[in-house]
Amino acid sequence: MTIRELEGFYKGKRVLVTGHTGFKGAWLCRMLGLAGAQVTGYALSPPTDPSLFEIAGLEDCMDSVIGDIRDLKHLREVFDRVRPEVVFHLAAQPIVRDSYKDPVYTYETNVMGTVNVLECVRLTKSVRSFLNVRSEEHTSELQSL
């Protein structure tokens, strides 16, 4: 798909991306910005230094909100302010090894954080499209601890 084709759908649309400071989220925001979308991101601070988010200069071409999807009140405030038409949910704790080290944090983020995003989508009348993106890693395979 070309940027021109993406423009046909996204130009001028209000798009909210959770996890925008991560690798996939940063690339998605870059493409959405090039397609003319009004992009707002909601995520923890960039996970690496330097990060793709910073290298790509995304902080200068989008609205970046630092927050935690486990914080329903703050997330709801952002949804109310932005009134997104499209929501991409990429925020997660994606590292399998880390999930073994801190399963409670992983559950709170990946399950309850997603519940919070879905609740905000449900309560935000402007949302017309929602996409939930997951990691390429899977905890279903047994790995040595």
Predicted regions and their residues:
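N-terminal Rossmann-like NAD(P)+-binding domain of SDR-like oxidoreductases, especially those catalyzing
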Residues: 1-140, 144
